[in-house]
A protein has these predicted regions:
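Short beta-strand/turn micro-motifs at beta-sheet edges
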Residues: 59-65
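Short, conserved charged micro-motifs
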Residues: 16, 82-87
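Core segments of cupin and vicinal oxygen chelate
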Residues: 8-57
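Vicinal oxygen chelate
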Residues: 86-113
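N-terminal beta-strand motif that seeds the catalytic metal site of vicinal oxygen chelate
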Residues: 1-18, 72-77
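Short connector loops at helix/strand junctions that flank enzyme active sites
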Residues: 2, 43-45, 68-72
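Short hydrophobic/aromatic beta-strand or adjacent loop that forms the aromatic wall/cage
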Residues: 35-37, 72, 110-112
Length: 113
């Protein structure tokens, strides 16, 4: 079996979250989706599971973090060029995302949050 990673995120608006990830270039896998969770595919081995709070709570043993006041995690996506990074971030901003800090250039990589 191929190694895969499933990043599970608790979301308050499932459709809006799905639309956001679609704008970033993810696709939906309906086989692993229902009205309480959507499987969004980044690559053959990387998936983001968007789960309602109710469904997420079935898997979690602690309360769901309030991400308006706390950071629940940091996840990075590697792209081939700065232009691809800028395009993805701009698509995310158009889809309702926010960019709390400016791009940082480390020479060997760029970071946009």
């Amino acid at each position: 079996m191929a190694k895969q990673i499933f990043i599970n995120l608790a979301v308050t608006d499932l459709q809006r979250s799905m639309d956001f990830y679609t704008a970033l270039g993810f696709t939906n896998n309906p086989q692993f989706s229902d009205d309480m969770g959507k499987c969004m595919v980044w690559s053959e081995h990387i998936f983001v599971m968007l789960l309602t709070h109710e469904k997420f709570a079935n898997f979690a043993t602690k309360p769901i973090a309030d991400t308006k006041s706390s950071v629940a995690g940091l996840f990075s996506l590697a792209l081939d060029s700065v232009d691809e990074v800028n395009s993805m971030v701009n698509n995310g901003l158009k889809a309702g995302g926010t960019e709390p800090s400016e791009m940082k250039d480390y020479g060997f990589m760029q970071q946009r949050t």
